Amino acid sequence: MKKFLSLVLALVMTMSLVTVSAGAKDFTDSTKIQYKEAVDVMSAVKVIDGYAEGDFRPTATLTRGAAAKIICNMILGPTTASALVADAAPYKDVPTNHTFAGYIAYCQKTGIISGYADGTFKPANSLTGYAFMKMLLGALGYKADVEGYTSPNWSINVAKQAINAGLNKGLKGDFNGVKAVNREEACLYAFNTLKATMVEYDKNSTVIVGNITIKEQSDAKEMANTGKTDGNIDKDGKMQFAEKYFTDLKGVATTDEFSRPATMWKVKSEEIGTYTDTADATYTKKVEIGDIYKDLGLGKSISAKKVSVLSLIHI
């Protein structure tokens, strides 16, 4: 995992964390958005959009039905997803003419979502961070029945894999999975999913011992990418979600005007914006190497020579 430090040697009054091109979505309430990079990118690829009034409403609660739409937009693309229809009511409270019926039906059939024991889905209800992370992990290829997402302790299994996949990266404060997800948090988690590596499973094997047949399910393994899209997100030979489903989206490593590490996002030739990477730790005074190790979560076996300062600002 890439880690860097920002050692600020003087107060910088005009330091900007983001430079946005004219092509980026300009919501009327953009100053209230905490996760601007995520919202800008997810808006640019048309996974999520604002309201007719021109605002985004970042703290508005995400509904279960809207979450299903986001997942479908991510997997199928917004054009194909918008044409989804439900041949039959997927749940008794989701008739075929419901606004989100097609999205909900698709997610149900692919095993990404499940309803309640009484046969309802409650599309207008909010959903927790755990529930949305579960949907995003399903989009990445994780199988709910194999990974324990349907067991009594499903939230623990979801939290572990979601955090390992980096789906909560950049979240301000600790991840609270029982709290209802708002719109900008949903954008952040979905944006991190675009950068996450997809998984797949080998075919199940069957072993017969006497009169007993045992079916063995393989573990999830990272999906390889040997095609031209490798490098759109990470040049690592692995298939990141966006490299499979958003092949026109590219994140280019660069630096901002203060020489800090940054990422320039673009769709085809249209630039979305350039966003400064979030430092793993920032210091404004003398610091001991032991404190740096602790802040970066590094073990004692790692040499101090491997800790690099990628942003050193002199004013």
What are these regions (language model features)?
Residues 2-36, 49-68, 72-100, 110-127, ...:
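Feature responds to low-complexity, polar/acidic, surface-exposed segments characteristic
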Residues 191:
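Conserved redox-cofactor binding core of oxidoreductases
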